[in-house]
């Protein structure tokens, strides 16, 4: 669709010029908000994520997925070890990570995502907060306890906002990693989502295919709110 000749995403850096990678990433993220993609995602949530994750419906997912392209040619750009809580995600949501490139080999460690077990994550995150550690200090503290996620296309890692995760180091494999991550939350915990509120950052997933069809049959919002009058904007509410 974008005009690049590419058979293996692991070699994306050879097909896409460096100064165009951001444009590709931005377009892929935007495409995840298309109706076709959202419907496919919601079906995946109902059929796979909810039962596998033992989640209670209704659930909400974020509106735009995060598509990540981790190049081997930009050693200064990588994802530091962190928790979702540090990035403003509430305790009630969970993260999902899906690799689109195979990172199962030991030598893929620096281009895969790494994660720490939940008990150690809670312990070391609190230790870092109490001592107000810098990013470099946290990286050195967390690194010995990180485990490589060995997975490939079709795999999914579901984890909490308390898990410490990230790449933590430059990609030195000579191959690109492409992945997608997003968040899901059970509706009953809507007040525990931090600043990622339903209706804004997240939207509810219809619980059945019938409900999905009914929503799809509704008139578009553009037509619904078009009354021929000018829009009104409130610049201040006192």
Residue spans of the language-model regions?
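Conserved double-stranded beta-helix
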Residues: 120-238
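Intrinsically disordered, low-complexity coil segments
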Residues: 50-57, 103-112, 173-175, 210
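Short, solvent-exposed loop/turn segments at secondary-structure junctions
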Residues: 67, 72-74, 86, 101-105, ...
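N-terminal alpha-helical interaction blocks
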Residues: 2-16
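Signature of the catalytic double-stranded beta-helix
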Residues: 13-74, 79-91
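A structural signal for short, well-ordered beta-strand segments and their strand-loop junctions
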Residues: 58-66, 95-99, 109-115, 158-160, ...
């Amino acid at each position: 669709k974008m005009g690049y000749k590419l058979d293996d995403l692991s070699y994306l850096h050879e097909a896409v010029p460096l100064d165009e990678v951001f444009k590709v990433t931005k377009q892929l993220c935007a495409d995840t908000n298309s109706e076709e993609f959202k419907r496919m995602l919601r079906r995946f949530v109902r059929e796979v994520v909810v039962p596998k994750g033992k989640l209670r419906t209704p659930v909400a997912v974020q509106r735009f997925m995060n598509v990540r392209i981790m190049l081997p040619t930009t050693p200064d750009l990588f994802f530091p070890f962190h928790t979702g809580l540090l990035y403003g995600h509430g305790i009630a949501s969970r993260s999902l990570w899906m690799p689109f490139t195979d990172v199962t080999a030991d030598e893929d460690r620096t281009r895969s995502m790494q994660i720490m077990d939940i008990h150690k994550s809670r312990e070391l995150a609190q230790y870092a907060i109490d001592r107000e550690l810098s990013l470099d200090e946290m990286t050195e503290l967390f690194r010995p306890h990180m485990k490589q996620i060995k997975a490939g296309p079709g795999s999914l890692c579901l984890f909490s906002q308390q898990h410490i995760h990230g790449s933590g180091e430059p990609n030195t494999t000579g191959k690109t990693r492409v992945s997608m991550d997003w968040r899901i939350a059970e509706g009953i915990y809507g007040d525990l989502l931090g600043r990622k509120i339903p209706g804004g950052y997240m939207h509810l997933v219809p619980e059945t295919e019938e409900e999905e069809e009914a929503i799809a049959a509704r008139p578009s919002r553009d037509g619904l709110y078009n009354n021929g009058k000018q829009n009104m904007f409130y610049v201040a509410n006192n």
